[in-house]
Amino acid sequence: MNKITKANFKKLVLVLTLTLAMTLGMSISVFAATGAVNGYTATGSSTITRTAASASTRYGKSTGSISVDSTYSYVNTYTLATGTSTKSTGYYTSVYVDFSAPYNCHSVRIRSSHKVSAYGQTWTANSTAVY
């Protein structure tokens, strides 16, 4: 019977840790971008899970305008047919859109464009999350 050496044990622990991290990482994906408009923080993010996705744009001051435009892609797990859905919204301080995959479908990707305009300045960013 083979003995487990200290070096082999370390390799085994490393492989198991990486496998666990990759498995957990596949369950949710998040991408966020951060900037500033007139000294206040602007953040845009996209999040995706197996059957849902969401995107948001936030601004640290309740003035000006903010928006998020998102396209969500999904695939039918039986027919492999693909589909997309698009949503847009705009307001002050914080905006949010969410999507749910249709029956027998799972998420593929969400792409979002974020925009904050205030005090004569504009911040834009794109975010993509993939399942």
Put a short name on every predicted segment:
Residues 1-50:
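N-terminal prepro-regions of secreted/extracellular proteins
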Residues 31-131:
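Post-signal peptide N-terminal regions of Sec-secreted extracellular proteins
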